[in-house]
Design a protein with these regions (language model features):
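Small-aliphatic-rich amphipathic alpha-helix that forms the alpha element of a beta-alpha
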Residues: 59, 78, 106, 148-159, ...
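A solvent-exposed interaction/effector surface
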Residues: 25, 203-206
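Bacterial N-terminal signal peptides that target proteins for export
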Residues: 2-15
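A glycine-rich helix N-cap at a beta->alpha junction
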Residues: 209-225
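Helix N-cap/coil-helix junction residues
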Residues: 190, 208-209
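Bacterial Sec-dependent signal peptides at the C-terminal "C-region" and cleavage site
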Residues: 19-37
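Short, small-residue-rich loop/turn micro-motifs
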Residues: 45, 152-156, 223
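N-terminal amphipathic, basic helical "cap/leader" segment at the start of enzyme domains
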Residues: 31-146
């Protein structure tokens, strides 16, 4: 009898160890999968040699880009300027928004895929492995050469009870972010142009946008050719 009990307890112990090990492996795999979907950006310095007035003076639209890569450091500065957190204690951002809805989502499209910018943490969350720059370019194929394309989307659910005016408020909020991008690009020595032309059907599908999210503006970003 003792032998049988020992065998049973030994078997149960092995089963417990196996379950714990399997759970640990599964948890680790899940964590690794999530980690692989998140890309941390360098902390922005939040500084530039160019003054605001100089940036306003020199800002101009560019539609002819080289394929020179935009560094992660410059991308981080640009995204922070677009709608990054500038008041950490209240989580408020650089761009104003109606009723502080912070409804504008910024997607970053490159040859390696598409990411959603996450201001809280200054990181990118991958949403697609596809190069969506041609879809952003739409009928104006030349701008697809730009190494980065930023896509501005309004999430109407952020307006809550004020949803009736969400379409107009979202468009205005996108304008604020767009202007931040224009001025930051100038200060960083980058080139851009605000555009509305894009293949919205393809982008909505590939970025997994539901009916409450509206594609509004896009910005090819790179260096003038």
């Amino acid at each position: 009898m003792n032998f049988k009990k020992t065998s049973i307890f030994t078997a149960l112990s092995f089963m417990t160890v196996a379950v714990v090990a399997a759970t640990s492996i599964a948890t680790t795999s899940c964590q690794n999968a999530n980690a692989s979907d998140t890309r941390s950006l360098p902390a922005p310095t939040k500084s530039a040699k160019m003054t605001l007035m100089e940036s306003l003076q020199q800002r101009h639209s560019v539609r002819d880009f080289s394929d020179k890569v935009v560094s992660d450091a410059d991308l981080s500065e640009l995204l922070w300027a677009a709608c990054g957190i500038n008041r950490p204690d209240t989580k408020k951002i650089t761009a104003p928004s109606a009723i502080n809805a912070q409804d504008i989502l910024v997607y970053v499209c490159t040859k390696d895929g598409a990411w959603l910018y996450v201001p809280d943490g200054n990181s990118l969350h991958k949403v697609s492995d596809k190069d969506l720059r041609p879809a952003v370019a739409g009928r104006q194929e030349a701008v697809a050469v730009a190494p980065v394309s930023l896509v501005l989307v309004s999430d109407r659910t952020k307006f809550g009870d004020c949803a009736k005016g969400a379409e107009v408020m979202g468009a205005i909020d996108a304008g604020y972010v767009s202007q931040n991008i224009c001025l930051a690009c100038t200060a960083l020595g980058l080139a851009t142009v605000p555009r509305m032309t894009m293949d919205k059907e393809t982008l909505a599908k590939e970025l997994h946008l539901d009916e409450n999210k509206t594609l509004l503006v896009n910005h090819p970003v790179g260096y003038e050719k």
